[in-house]
Amino acid sequence: WADLNTNNLDDPGAFYGVTSVYESNENMTITCSTKVCSFGKQVVEKVETEYARNEGGRFVYRIQRSPMCEYMVNFIHKLKHLPEKYMMNSVLENFTILQVVSNRDTQETLLCAAFVFEVSNSEHGAQHHIYRLVKT
């Protein structure tokens, strides 16, 4: 999630990036594909490869401070400058991010997450909900 109430977004030298941490019982190389979709169509995709680090018997994968693409930076700027929250939500209704983490060597999908956004009216800042989809 993101906090649009911060003033740092207007700083010309602001850094826009994402940090992700994954963990596994197995040593492997992973690829993380992040697709930005607008109105159901893919706009941009970023694919990153990460190698395991053994940390106390667990294999940890850290993608740290991965820079956002220019499309995302511009999107955030335009969204932040809309005058009303309902306008922001109208834009966000047609915006999603799909992230797929796979074993690079076997192509097995390890994790698939879809991010759907809305502007929170909460006094407590950004909120999130996590749902797990399973086969029955």
Curated annotation (Swiss-Prot):
Keywords: Activator, Developmental protein, DNA-binding, Metal-binding, Nucleus, Transcription, Transcription regulation, Zinc, Zinc-finger. InterPro entries: TEC1_TEAD_TF, YBD. GO terms for cellular component: nucleus; transcription regulator complex. It comes from the Eukaryota. GO terms for molecular function: DNA-binding transcription factor activity, RNA polymerase II-specific; RNA polymerase II cis-regulatory region sequence-specific DNA binding; zinc ion binding. Gene3D superfamilies: 2.70.50.80. It is found in: Nucleus. Its main location: nucleus. One of its GO terms (biological process) is embryonic organ development. PANTHER family: PROTEIN SCALLOPED, TRANSCRIPTIONAL ENHANCER FACTOR TEF RELATED. Probable transcription factor that function in the regulation of cell-specific gene expression during drosophila development, particularly in the differentiation of the nervous system. This is Protein scalloped.
